[in-house]
Amino acid sequence: MLYIVDFDETITTYDTIHLLAEAVNKPEEWSVISDKYWQEYLAWREALPHSTTLTSYLPLLGGSRYLEEASIKRIEKSQYFSGLSEGALDNIVQLITLRAGFVEFINALVPDLRVSKTIFHVLSVNWSARVIEQTLLHHTDLTADLLCVHANDFDFDTSTNTTNGRILARNASSLLMNSTDKVREFRRIVQTDAVSSPLNVVYIGDSPTDFGCLQISPISILMRSNQKYYDILSRFEDVQLVDISEFPVQKAVPGKKIIYTCSDWCAIQKAFLA
């Protein structure tokens, strides 16, 4: 089985981006940066036309990339994330809580991961692949050779061993900012690592940045971290939402993509590892 999994609010209980910002401890400066982003994001979202299908909605989501690019350019220009040590980033790990059942699920996979019977990737638009990796290593039985994190990451100045304010792609062909970017990397991962049959590929995510991968993955699971994202998918004519307890569905509705739903990893473990 090949698992490709989102991080924030899929593996974690809450979004972790604010923890990265708080590590710098410049709340007023961060408020200016984040307020500007949300003003632009809300204006973009309000201008989106109504979509009745996921297929028509995904190109609209792809149009958000200019917002994310502008945001990262502002962050880099301000040097907001300059001067962070590896230790400061690693301290964030202690503040991150994982969604119920994840530790048990991933630890149950470890024997198969060690013999490459199962492969585990994290695919995220988060800005710190290091924090993602250290979180998983800290909370679970995973070792660095058993996972691969595809995300953005802070660039380090080798002369000071601190961040230089730039954000780069890690294990990705370019920065990961939106649903379209994640689809690109999803396809690359599958092409490289898919085992025996494409039906062995599972994608798990929770938000619109995951919708593209949820559409194309042979097995797709929506983590119900936010009701509004479930509601968005439920209105699409080409989507069939099914509780994970019904996996595998014996008869799909023609023309509809099955997306399984759950609220924790206990349900996923029961469906796949029981």
From Swiss-Prot:
The keyword Cytoplasm applies. It is found in: Cytoplasm; Nucleus. Transmembrane segments: none annotated. Its main location: cytoplasm. InterPro entries: HAD-like_hydrolase_phosphatase, HAD-like_sf, HAD_sf. PANTHER family: COLD TOLERANCE PROTEIN 1 (PTHR28181:SF1), UPF0655 PROTEIN YCR015C (PTHR28181). The keyword Nucleotidyltransferase does not apply. Belongs to the CTO1 family. GO terms for cellular component: cytosol; nucleus. Keywords: Cytoplasm, Nucleus. This is CTO1 family protein C17G9.12c. GO terms for molecular function: hydrolase activity.
